[in-house]
Amino acid sequence: MEHHIRYDAAQRALILLDQRLLPTRQEDFVCRTTEDIVTALQVMVVRGAPAIGVTAAWGCVLAAYEAAEAGDHWHPVLDGLLERIAKARPTAVNLRWAVDRMRKVWKTAGHAPFATLISLWESEARRIHRDDIEINRAMGRHGAALIDEGDTVMTHCNAGALATAGYGTALGVIRGAVDAGKKISVIANETRPFLQGARLTAYELHEDHIPVTVACDNACGHLMRKGMVQKVVVGADRIAANGDAANKIGTYSVALLAREHGVPFYVAAPLSTIDRNTPDGDHIPIEDRTPREVTHVGDTQITPDGVPVYNFAFDVTPAALIAGIVTEVGVLRPPYTESIAEAFRKAGLE
């Protein structure tokens, strides 16, 4: 499943599989402008930190074509469009990371002709896209060692191929274990209110013939108490320098339950998701989404008119609850301030 984000150079379009419609319908959402990209990000046509980063990189290419219509004044126009993309969603650090990486290419190009910049940016976006798949497969190999034969692994939200350029982070670890010949099964928490676990994780694993059972979010403690969960593996949208990890709302509760029941809790994320400029989880911005995602199921209203809603998209799991962070350079262990710094040195990213 590596074709849900496709760039068509001839059409100057980014073609996204519309994840809002899965698993019952498979339709494309075509982006030709900056606003198309921003809309796709905000309404979650595409979601998941690495996939958001890849989409943003290709969005920069579309923004360049759009800015070219301003003639000689395209530089400031392009700058504004890039910032519009970078601010589309606040929590996933890969969004700003990808835009900044494209900006760096622009800066290096200096006053090169527009056609040269487009060529450089298409190459860089393609590299970001390709590298993400390779990074996820590396994480899968490292993380597979954490999963034992016969394990049932719980995961929350969707950190699979659909949340990345391909293969997945948390689901990459699960796929890595299966590729290593281990017979395992998965519990996918439904993940209210957007139901990424029920709709997307179950869809991916079922398509790959990996045994998966969907559980309502409130069943986590019961399942662990009954000994039905041996490991928990989740993804992350931003990891602070101290190892605190922001992931889909409800992850913190799962981590607390895992500690109570002695179930190892792991986070799988590329180094690009680690924000060393954010000291701890208290400094991670948390997106507050539209109340309608909670007040309605489809077109059916389920709450009384006028009742306020909390719809935080993410929460922060403290580093103390995380047994290990699976990255492309290996599994990081506490104390994370030290192991994160060492991982960046190992990757040559100091």
Swiss-Prot record:
Keywords: Amino-acid biosynthesis, Isomerase, Methionine biosynthesis. The keyword Lipoprotein does not apply. One of its GO terms (molecular function) is S-methyl-5-thioribose-1-phosphate isomerase activity. Substrate binds at residues 47-49, 89, 196, 247-248. The active site is at 237 (proton donor). It catalyses: 5-(methylsulfanyl)-alpha-D-ribose 1-phosphate = 5-(methylsulfanyl)-D-ribulose 1-phosphate. Pathway: Amino-acid biosynthesis; L-methionine biosynthesis via salvage pathway; L-methionine from S-methyl-5-thio-alpha-D-ribose 1-phosphate: step 1/6. Its EC number is 5.3.1.23. Pfam families: IF-2B. The record marks 157 as: Transition state stabilizer. The keyword Amino-acid biosynthesis applies. It comes from the Bacteria. GO terms for biological process: L-methionine salvage from methylthioadenosine. Catalyzes the interconversion of methylthioribose-1-phosphate (MTR-1-P) into methylthioribulose-1-phosphate (MTRu-1-P). HAMAP family: Salvage_MtnA. PANTHER family: METHYLTHIORIBOSE-1-PHOSPHATE ISOMERASE (PTHR43475:SF1). Belongs to the eIF-2B alpha/beta/delta subunits family. MtnA subfamily. This is Methylthioribose-1-phosphate isomerase. The lineage of its organism: Bacteria, Pseudomonadati, Thermodesulfobacteriota, Desulfovibrionia, Desulfovibrionales. The gene is mtnA.
